[in-house]
From Swiss-Prot:
InterPro entries attached to this UniProt entry: Ser_inhib-like_sf, TIL_dom
Similarity annotation: Belongs to the polydnaviridae EGF-like motif protein family.
Name of the protein this chain belongs to: Probable protease inhibitor Egf0.4b
Domain TIL: 35-87
UniProt cross-references to SUPFAM superfamilies, sorted A to Z: Serine protease inhibitors
UniProt gene name: O11
UniProt keywords, alphabetically: Signal
Stretch forming the signal peptide: 1-22
Organism listed in the record: Microplitis demolitor bracovirus (isolate Webb) (MdBV)
């Protein structure tokens, strides 16, 4: 009798575990559409994002999100990720980090 109850509990636990592991919430599919255009999901990245008006940020005034501009893109004043070369008033002397421009 006791072994039948144990077997039943074990079976229910296994089914629940399989259901949790195969649920869409544990897959990466929810990330599709989570970030905006030219952004990529990265929950492990820390620091400040480069911006058109601040190519070498040392202090972030707002909390960093998990959506970062893709390589070759920086944020403009409206927080949209645009190509580095599309930043207004970018002088040729202004250098962005190699991780941003993809060198």
């Amino acid at each position: 009798m006791m072994s039948e109850k144990f077997a039943l509990v074990l079976l229910v636990a296994c089914i629940a575990f399989i259901g949790i592991e195969t649920s869409p919430i544990n897959s990466d599919s929810w990330k599709d559409g989570f970030c905006g255009e030219n952004e990529a999901y990265d929950s492990m990245r820390r620091g400040c994002e480069e911006r058109c008006d601040d190519h070498n940020p040392t202090f972030c005034f707002k909390f960093t999100t998990v959506c970062w501009c893709e390589k070759g893109y920086v944020r403009d004043k409206s927080d949209t990720c645009i190509k580095v070369e599309d930043c207004p008033n970018v002088s040729e002397n202004l250098e962005f980090s190699e991780t941003i421009i993809g060198m």
